[in-house]
Amino acid sequence: MKDLKDLNLLDRFLFAEAMEDPQNMRDVLEIILGKDVVLKHLPQTEKEARISPAYRFAKVDVWAKDTDEVVYDTEVQGTNTKNLPKRSRYYESIIDAKLLKPGERDFNKMNDVYIILIAPFDLFGKRKYMYTFEMTCKEDPSVSLEDGATRIFLNTHGENPDEVSPELVELLHYIEHTTQDMADGCKSERIHKMQKRICSIKSSEEVSVRYMQRWEEMEMEKEAARELGLAEGRTQGLTEGRTQGLAEGRAEGRAEGRAEGRSSMARLIDKLLEENRIEDCKRIAKDPEFCQHLMEEFGIE
Protein backbone atom coordinates (compact mmCIF):
# COMPACT_ATOMS: atom_id res chain seq x y z
CA MET A 1 0.00 0.00 0.00
CA LYS A 2 1.39 3.40 -1.01
CA ASP A 3 1.44 6.24 1.47
CA LEU A 4 -1.11 8.93 0.67
CA LYS A 5 1.71 11.44 0.15
CA ASP A 6 3.21 9.20 -2.56
CA LEU A 7 0.06 8.92 -4.66
CA ASN A 8 -0.18 10.64 -8.02
CA LEU A 9 -3.23 11.66 -10.00
CA LEU A 10 -3.21 8.39 -11.94
CA ASP A 11 -4.25 6.74 -8.66
CA ARG A 12 -8.04 6.70 -8.66
CA PHE A 13 -8.35 7.62 -4.99
CA LEU A 14 -6.30 10.81 -5.26
CA PHE A 15 -7.84 11.70 -8.62
CA ALA A 16 -11.35 11.43 -7.16
CA GLU A 17 -10.40 13.42 -4.06
CA ALA A 18 -8.76 16.14 -6.16
CA MET A 19 -11.57 16.41 -8.71
CA GLU A 20 -14.21 16.87 -6.02
CA ASP A 21 -12.82 20.39 -5.92
CA PRO A 22 -14.64 22.09 -8.82
CA GLN A 23 -11.66 24.35 -9.50
CA ASN A 24 -9.40 21.34 -10.10
CA MET A 25 -12.04 19.75 -12.32
CA ARG A 26 -12.52 22.96 -14.26
CA ASP A 27 -8.78 23.48 -14.74
CA VAL A 28 -8.26 19.92 -15.99
CA LEU A 29 -11.15 20.16 -18.47
CA GLU A 30 -10.12 23.59 -19.73
CA ILE A 31 -6.51 22.54 -20.29
CA ILE A 32 -7.54 19.35 -22.09
CA LEU A 33 -10.27 20.90 -24.24
CA GLY A 34 -8.68 24.30 -24.80
CA LYS A 35 -11.89 26.17 -24.01
CA ASP A 36 -13.65 27.78 -21.05
CA VAL A 37 -15.73 25.40 -18.93
CA VAL A 38 -18.18 26.67 -16.31
CA LEU A 39 -19.47 23.81 -14.18
CA LYS A 40 -23.17 23.77 -13.36
CA HIS A 41 -22.91 21.40 -10.39
CA LEU A 42 -20.22 20.06 -8.10
CA PRO A 43 -18.37 17.14 -9.74
CA GLN A 44 -19.52 13.67 -8.68
CA THR A 45 -16.77 11.16 -8.03
CA GLU A 46 -17.06 7.37 -8.38
CA LYS A 47 -20.61 7.80 -9.63
CA GLU A 48 -22.38 4.45 -10.12
CA ALA A 49 -24.18 3.98 -13.41
CA ARG A 50 -26.35 1.03 -14.40
CA ILE A 51 -28.92 0.67 -17.17
CA SER A 52 -30.96 -1.89 -15.21
CA PRO A 53 -30.46 -4.27 -12.27
CA ALA A 54 -30.01 -7.13 -14.74
CA TYR A 55 -26.83 -5.65 -16.20
CA ARG A 56 -23.44 -4.92 -14.70
CA PHE A 57 -22.84 -1.49 -13.25
CA ALA A 58 -19.98 0.84 -14.04
CA LYS A 59 -18.35 3.26 -11.65
CA VAL A 60 -17.21 6.40 -13.46
CA ASP A 61 -14.26 8.19 -11.87
CA VAL A 62 -15.51 11.77 -12.15
CA TRP A 63 -18.79 12.97 -13.63
CA ALA A 64 -19.47 16.66 -14.30
CA LYS A 65 -21.86 18.90 -16.23
CA ASP A 66 -21.30 22.46 -17.41
CA THR A 67 -23.70 25.38 -17.85
CA ASP A 68 -24.17 24.41 -21.52
CA GLU A 69 -25.47 21.02 -20.29
CA VAL A 70 -22.41 19.21 -21.66
CA VAL A 71 -21.61 16.05 -19.68
CA TYR A 72 -18.01 15.01 -18.93
CA ASP A 73 -16.85 11.59 -17.75
CA THR A 74 -13.15 11.76 -16.88
CA GLU A 75 -11.24 8.57 -16.09
CA VAL A 76 -7.67 7.65 -15.15
CA GLN A 77 -6.26 4.25 -16.05
CA GLY A 78 -2.92 3.04 -14.73
CA THR A 79 -2.64 -0.23 -16.68
CA ASN A 80 -3.54 -1.25 -20.22
CA THR A 81 -6.37 -3.75 -19.85
CA LYS A 82 -6.61 -4.16 -23.65
CA ASN A 83 -10.30 -3.23 -23.66
CA LEU A 84 -10.31 0.54 -23.15
CA PRO A 85 -11.87 1.56 -26.49
CA LYS A 86 -14.84 -0.75 -25.91
CA ARG A 87 -15.00 0.21 -22.27
CA SER A 88 -15.29 3.87 -23.32
CA ARG A 89 -18.12 2.84 -25.62
CA TYR A 90 -19.86 1.10 -22.73
CA TYR A 91 -19.48 4.11 -20.44
CA GLU A 92 -20.87 6.36 -23.15
CA SER A 93 -23.87 4.06 -23.67
CA ILE A 94 -24.88 3.96 -20.01
CA ILE A 95 -24.48 7.73 -19.70
CA ASP A 96 -26.59 8.21 -22.84
CA ALA A 97 -29.29 5.92 -21.47
CA LYS A 98 -29.86 8.30 -18.56
CA LEU A 99 -29.83 11.60 -20.45
CA LEU A 100 -33.46 11.60 -21.59
CA LYS A 101 -36.41 11.46 -19.23
CA PRO A 102 -38.94 8.62 -19.68
CA GLY A 103 -41.36 9.48 -22.46
CA GLU A 104 -39.09 12.09 -24.06
CA ARG A 105 -39.17 11.61 -27.85
CA ASP A 106 -36.89 14.41 -28.98
CA PHE A 107 -33.41 12.90 -29.26
CA ASN A 108 -32.01 16.33 -30.07
CA LYS A 109 -32.40 17.08 -26.38
CA MET A 110 -29.64 14.62 -25.55
CA ASN A 111 -26.63 16.30 -23.97
CA ASP A 112 -23.28 16.43 -25.69
CA VAL A 113 -20.96 13.96 -23.94
CA TYR A 114 -17.19 13.80 -23.54
CA ILE A 115 -15.55 10.57 -22.40
CA ILE A 116 -11.97 11.44 -21.38
CA LEU A 117 -9.45 8.76 -20.45
CA ILE A 118 -5.96 9.60 -19.14
CA ALA A 119 -3.30 6.87 -19.16
CA PRO A 120 0.51 6.48 -18.87
CA PHE A 121 0.75 4.48 -22.09
CA ASP A 122 0.11 4.94 -25.80
CA LEU A 123 -3.05 3.01 -26.61
CA PHE A 124 -2.74 3.50 -30.37
CA GLY A 125 1.03 3.52 -30.88
CA LYS A 126 1.23 6.82 -32.77
CA ARG A 127 3.22 8.64 -30.05
CA LYS A 128 0.59 11.33 -29.61
CA TYR A 129 -0.40 13.05 -26.39
CA MET A 130 -4.04 13.25 -27.43
CA TYR A 131 -6.31 11.11 -29.61
CA THR A 132 -9.78 12.60 -30.22
CA PHE A 133 -12.53 10.50 -31.78
CA GLU A 134 -15.80 11.71 -33.28
CA MET A 135 -18.09 9.95 -35.74
CA THR A 136 -17.33 10.67 -39.40
CA CYS A 137 -18.36 9.03 -42.66
CA LYS A 138 -16.01 6.27 -43.83
CA GLU A 139 -16.71 7.02 -47.49
CA ASP A 140 -16.28 10.79 -47.04
CA PRO A 141 -14.40 11.82 -43.86
CA SER A 142 -15.46 15.44 -44.41
CA VAL A 143 -19.01 14.42 -43.44
CA SER A 144 -19.46 14.46 -39.66
CA LEU A 145 -22.29 12.62 -37.92
CA GLU A 146 -22.56 15.42 -35.33
CA ASP A 147 -24.14 13.18 -32.71
CA GLY A 148 -22.58 15.15 -29.86
CA ALA A 149 -20.34 12.31 -28.64
CA THR A 150 -16.58 12.78 -28.27
CA ARG A 151 -14.07 10.34 -26.86
CA ILE A 152 -10.58 11.54 -25.93
CA PHE A 153 -7.66 9.28 -25.00
CA LEU A 154 -4.69 11.07 -23.41
CA ASN A 155 -1.20 9.56 -23.26
CA THR A 156 1.21 11.00 -20.69
CA HIS A 157 4.14 9.66 -22.76
CA GLY A 158 3.33 11.47 -26.01
CA GLU A 159 6.09 12.72 -28.29
CA ASN A 160 4.32 15.42 -30.34
CA PRO A 161 4.49 18.56 -28.16
CA ASP A 162 4.23 20.81 -31.23
CA GLU A 163 0.70 19.52 -31.93
CA VAL A 164 -0.81 20.25 -28.50
CA SER A 165 -0.62 23.10 -26.02
CA PRO A 166 2.45 23.32 -23.74
CA GLU A 167 0.08 23.47 -20.77
CA LEU A 168 -1.49 20.14 -21.74
CA VAL A 169 1.95 18.52 -21.89
CA GLU A 170 2.74 19.91 -18.43
CA LEU A 171 -0.61 18.71 -17.07
CA LEU A 172 -0.13 15.17 -18.36
CA HIS A 173 3.37 14.96 -16.92
CA TYR A 174 2.07 16.34 -13.62
CA ILE A 175 -0.79 13.83 -13.52
CA GLU A 176 1.72 10.99 -13.80
CA HIS A 177 4.22 12.54 -11.37
CA THR A 178 2.22 14.59 -8.87
CA THR A 179 5.14 16.04 -6.92
CA GLN A 180 6.32 19.45 -5.85
CA ASP A 181 9.40 19.18 -8.08
CA MET A 182 7.26 18.43 -11.13
CA ALA A 183 4.89 21.31 -10.34
CA ASP A 184 7.82 23.69 -9.82
CA GLY A 185 9.08 22.81 -13.28
CA CYS A 186 5.77 23.78 -14.89
CA LYS A 187 5.10 27.26 -16.27
CA SER A 188 1.33 26.87 -15.85
CA GLU A 189 -0.04 28.94 -13.00
CA ARG A 190 -3.08 26.65 -12.90
CA ILE A 191 -0.86 23.66 -12.18
CA HIS A 192 0.96 25.59 -9.42
CA LYS A 193 -2.38 26.33 -7.75
CA MET A 194 -3.56 22.76 -8.27
CA GLN A 195 -0.43 21.47 -6.53
CA LYS A 196 -1.20 23.62 -3.47
CA ARG A 197 -4.71 22.18 -3.28
CA ILE A 198 -3.41 18.62 -3.69
CA CYS A 199 -0.80 19.19 -0.98
CA SER A 200 -3.69 20.10 1.32
CA ILE A 201 -5.44 16.85 0.38
CA LYS A 202 -2.33 14.76 1.06
CA SER A 203 -1.79 16.39 4.45
CA SER A 204 -5.43 16.07 5.54
CA GLU A 205 -6.01 13.66 8.41
CA GLU A 206 -9.61 13.19 7.30
CA VAL A 207 -8.54 12.19 3.80
CA SER A 208 -5.87 9.89 5.26
CA VAL A 209 -8.54 8.06 7.26
CA ARG A 210 -10.73 7.70 4.15
CA TYR A 211 -7.76 6.36 2.21
CA MET A 212 -7.02 3.74 4.86
CA GLN A 213 -10.68 2.73 5.02
CA ARG A 214 -10.86 2.43 1.25
CA TRP A 215 -7.74 0.27 1.17
CA GLU A 216 -9.10 -2.02 3.89
CA GLU A 217 -12.45 -2.35 2.12
CA MET A 218 -10.78 -3.20 -1.18
CA GLU A 219 -8.54 -5.79 0.45
CA MET A 220 -11.55 -7.44 2.09
CA GLU A 221 -13.48 -7.40 -1.19
CA LYS A 222 -10.52 -8.85 -3.09
CA GLU A 223 -10.10 -11.63 -0.55
CA ALA A 224 -13.80 -12.45 -0.70
CA ALA A 225 -13.68 -12.44 -4.49
CA ARG A 226 -10.66 -14.75 -4.52
CA GLU A 227 -12.38 -17.19 -2.17
CA LEU A 228 -15.50 -17.20 -4.33
CA GLY A 229 -13.39 -17.64 -7.44
CA LEU A 230 -11.42 -20.51 -5.97
CA ALA A 231 -14.63 -22.25 -4.96
CA GLU A 232 -16.01 -21.85 -8.47
CA GLY A 233 -12.69 -22.96 -9.93
CA ARG A 234 -12.71 -26.13 -7.85
CA THR A 235 -16.27 -26.93 -8.92
CA GLN A 236 -15.53 -26.24 -12.57
CA GLY A 237 -12.29 -28.17 -12.39
CA LEU A 238 -13.93 -31.21 -10.84
CA THR A 239 -16.62 -31.18 -13.52
CA GLU A 240 -14.08 -30.92 -16.31
CA GLY A 241 -11.96 -33.55 -14.65
CA ARG A 242 -14.81 -36.04 -14.47
CA THR A 243 -15.72 -35.48 -18.11
CA GLN A 244 -12.17 -35.83 -19.31
CA GLY A 245 -11.58 -38.76 -16.98
CA LEU A 246 -14.13 -40.87 -18.80
CA ALA A 247 -11.86 -40.81 -21.83
CA GLU A 248 -8.38 -40.51 -20.35
CA GLY A 249 -8.60 -42.03 -16.93
CA ARG A 250 -10.52 -40.71 -13.97
CA ALA A 251 -7.58 -39.88 -11.72
CA GLU A 252 -5.60 -38.00 -14.36
CA GLY A 253 -8.72 -36.27 -15.69
CA ARG A 254 -9.78 -34.98 -12.30
CA ALA A 255 -6.30 -33.68 -11.57
CA GLU A 256 -6.00 -31.90 -14.89
CA GLY A 257 -9.55 -30.59 -14.66
CA ARG A 258 -8.96 -29.13 -11.23
CA ALA A 259 -5.68 -27.55 -12.31
CA GLU A 260 -7.13 -26.05 -15.48
CA GLY A 261 -10.23 -24.84 -13.65
CA ARG A 262 -8.20 -23.11 -10.97
CA SER A 263 -5.80 -21.65 -13.53
CA SER A 264 -8.53 -20.23 -15.77
CA MET A 265 -10.53 -18.88 -12.84
CA ALA A 266 -7.43 -17.34 -11.25
CA ARG A 267 -6.58 -15.55 -14.48
CA LEU A 268 -10.15 -14.28 -14.80
CA ILE A 269 -10.15 -13.01 -11.22
CA ASP A 270 -6.82 -11.26 -11.76
CA LYS A 271 -8.24 -9.52 -14.84
CA LEU A 272 -11.36 -8.42 -12.98
CA LEU A 273 -9.38 -7.16 -10.00
CA GLU A 274 -7.13 -5.14 -12.32
CA GLU A 275 -10.26 -3.29 -13.43
CA ASN A 276 -11.70 -3.13 -9.90
CA ARG A 277 -14.74 -5.17 -11.04
CA ILE A 278 -15.41 -6.54 -7.57
CA GLU A 279 -19.13 -7.13 -8.16
CA ASP A 280 -18.33 -9.25 -11.22
CA CYS A 281 -15.86 -11.29 -9.12
CA LYS A 282 -18.64 -12.07 -6.67
CA ARG A 283 -21.13 -12.94 -9.39
CA ILE A 284 -19.01 -15.47 -11.29
CA ALA A 285 -19.20 -17.98 -8.44
CA LYS A 286 -23.00 -18.04 -8.68
CA ASP A 287 -23.60 -17.56 -12.40
CA PRO A 288 -21.77 -20.04 -14.70
CA GLU A 289 -23.14 -18.41 -17.87
CA PHE A 290 -21.88 -15.00 -16.77
CA CYS A 291 -18.54 -16.58 -15.88
CA GLN A 292 -18.27 -18.11 -19.36
CA HIS A 293 -19.20 -14.75 -20.90
CA LEU A 294 -16.34 -13.07 -19.03
CA MET A 295 -13.94 -15.86 -20.02
CA GLU A 296 -14.77 -15.11 -23.65
CA GLU A 297 -14.53 -11.34 -23.07
CA PHE A 298 -10.95 -11.69 -21.81
CA GLY A 299 -9.99 -14.50 -24.21
CA ILE A 300 -9.41 -17.04 -21.42
CA GLU A 301 -9.78 -20.72 -22.32
Where are these regions (language model features)?
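Elongated, amphipathic alpha-helical interaction scaffolds
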Residues: M1-E301
